[in-house]
């Protein structure tokens, strides 16, 4: 699958034209503000970026990268959504995460030089790929980029630890509640309503991620609906009383995986009042 061209490839250049092209590519993105918390847009604020930057497009069901493929770049989700999945030797598959616009993925390949999971588009998706070695070189020269790179890696570790807690210590209802609250925060981080959003993933994918069956996911959603906590219309979820939902499942509220800034933080806080 060929990357979707932006304007032209940028590789090891310091020219003013190249800097302008790279900056324009991010400025034209509707999610440029959402990417600032992720850190990658800081690259374009530096005077002399040395980057290889490309945009990729995947249709629903297409692979962004596979387990075992060489690691070359990290990806910022520009639009759409993806899932990452691990496959055991016997063929069993476990969904390991969901990736939304403004978020960064791909760090699973840093340690071994090869990706440890397969990432698939849940819907038509665009990502911006940043070559890792030039990014690492830039981070050694620019403390702000280095700090954000470390924070992104730390976030990946924190997410993995949270998922271990999710699967090992919570009931099925708490697991689903934790995921819904997480998706609510992530919607707020993108500037959307924290009380109404689409589930980009199927019930089967949700069940795989939570370690329960798709039937259990459907039953729990019906239970939340019967309790007048939320409405579910196919993939559309609307919280009827988000503060009450958060209070009932208070054990899940302490985890804030999406770093909220400014208006997004205020939006999430108001939704819980």
Locations of regions flagged by a protein language model:
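Cyclic nucleotide-binding regulatory module and flanking cytosolic helices
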Residues: 2-60, 104-105, 110-111
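Cyclic nucleotide-binding regulatory domains
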Residues: 37, 46-47, 60-124
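Short aromatic/basic micro-patch
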Residues: 55, 74, 98, 129, ...
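A secondary-structure boundary/capping signal
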Residues: 60, 100-101, 131, 153, ...
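Alpha-helix/helix-capping structural signal
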Residues: 79, 133-134, 155, 204, ...
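Cyclic-nucleotide recognition modules
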Residues: 97-162
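Polybasic "coupling" helices that flank or enter modular domains
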Residues: 140-213
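Phosphate-/nucleic-acid-contacting segments
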Residues: 185-273
């Amino acid at each position: 699958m060929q990357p979707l061209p932006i304007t032209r490839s940028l590789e090891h250049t310091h020219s003013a034209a190249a800097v302008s092209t790279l900056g324009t590519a991010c400025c034209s993105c509707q999610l440029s503000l959402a990417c600032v918390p992720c850190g990658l847009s800081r690259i374009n604020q530096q005077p002399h970026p040395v980057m290889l930057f490309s945009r990729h497009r995947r249709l629903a069901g297409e692979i962004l990268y596979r387990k075992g493929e060489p690691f070359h770049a990290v990806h910022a989700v520009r639009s759409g959504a993806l899932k990452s999945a691990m496959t055991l030797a016997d063929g069993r598959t476990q969904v390991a995460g969901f990736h939304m616009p403004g978020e960064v993925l791909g760090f699973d390949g840093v340690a071994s030089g090869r990706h440890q999971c397969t990432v698939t588009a849940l819907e038509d998706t665009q990502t911006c790929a940043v070559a890792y070695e030039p990014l690492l070189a830039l981070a050694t020269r620019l403390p702000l980029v280095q700090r954000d790179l470390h924070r992104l890696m730390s976030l990946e570790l924190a997410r993995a630890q949270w998922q271990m807690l999710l699967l090992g210590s919570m009931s099925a209802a708490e697991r689903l509640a934790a995921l819904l609250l997480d998706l609510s925060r992530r919607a707020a981080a993108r500037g959307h309503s924290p009380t109404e959003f689409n589930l980009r993933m199927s019930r089967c994918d949700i069940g795989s991620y939570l370690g329960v069956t798709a039937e259990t996911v459907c039953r729990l959603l019906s239970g939340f609906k019967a309790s007048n906590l939320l409405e579910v219309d196919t993939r559309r979820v609307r919280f009827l009383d988000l503060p009450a939902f958060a209070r009932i499942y208070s054990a899940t509220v302490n985890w804030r995986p999406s770093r909220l800034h400014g208006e997004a933080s205020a939006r999430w806080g108001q939704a819980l009042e």
